[in-house]
């Protein structure tokens, strides 16, 4: 709002000044300078205005989405608990079934690494 008032005052001052004063090269340069400033100021005011409008829209959207998100969370909480209750025993069972294979793989990997280290020691000696 302040920027709009400032821009309006500058525009009125330029309009009044150009009508009241004779045109000379220096005044023409000053008029161009102020015209450029006016253009930049108007662009800045427009950007600020759009930014404020965007922020307002985002805040309104958040305000509208909060009740919906609360409802979704209320509906999903029992579902998440149910899924966790069903998945936990399955995961534990899978872990018990895979443990022997993992242990065997680990022991074989350790054996291969020992052989590689022994060979590396033999090569460096």
Curated annotation (Swiss-Prot):
Entry keyword set: Antifreeze protein, Secreted, Signal
Gene Ontology terms: cellular component: extracellular region
Stretch forming the signal peptide: 1-20
Compartments (UniProt record): Secreted
Top-level taxon of the source organism: Eukaryota
Functional summary from the UniProt entry: Antifreeze proteins lower the blood freezing point.
Family: Belongs to the apolipoprotein A1/A4/E family.
Protein name: Type-4 ice-structuring protein
Phylogenetic lineage: Eukaryota, Metazoa, Chordata, Craniata, Vertebrata
């Amino acid at each position: 709002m302040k920027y709009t008032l400032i821009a309006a005052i500058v525009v009125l001052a330029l309009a009044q000044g150009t009508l009241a004063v004779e045109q000379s090269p220096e005044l023409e340069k000053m008029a161009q300078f102020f015209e450029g400033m006016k253009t930049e100021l108007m662009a800045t005011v427009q950007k600020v205005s759009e930014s404020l409008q965007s922020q307002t829209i985002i805040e309104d959207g958040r305000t509208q989405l909060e009740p919906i998100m609360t409802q979704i969370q209320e509906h999903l909480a029992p579902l998440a608990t149910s899924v966790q209750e069903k998945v936990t025993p399955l995961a534990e069972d899978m872990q018990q079934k895979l443990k022997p294979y993992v242990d065997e793989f680990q022991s074989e990997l350790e054996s291969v690494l020992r052989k590689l280290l022994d060979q590396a020691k033999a090569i460096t000696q």
